[in-house]
Amino acid sequence: MRIGRNLVKMDVDMLRTVEASRYVVPLREGGSLPAVVEADDDALYVMKFVGAGQGPKALIAELIAGEIGRALGLNVPELVFMELSPLLSRTERDEEILDLLRASVGLNLGMRFLPGAFAYNSLLQPPPAADLASAIVW
């Protein structure tokens, strides 16, 4: 990725593409209904769906933000393109999830699932190191 005058140019060939093989569990946080999904490389990913309410622009923003964070030296989980087959929805019973899966067939965005990770909470102790906090805020 190269960052220059109000322009972010990314070489998307640097991202691997994996095939979603199993829908594990929805993450009912946020508006996009991401899910933990197993891929054909036997790894778990948090999949962000192109068919979610925010649409494909939200995934593009997440991809760009993740790669900018990586370029700045922040620890960012691996980002991958995830192919979603229409066959993955055949056993889903939840109508909302089923609609999302059907609307998201094709290319989506995934990030490596981090077991034991949790959302940032400023009340948790100890706070992040000052140099890490300043790098994130920058």
Model-derived regions, located:
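Conserved kinase catalytic-core segment
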Residues: 115-138
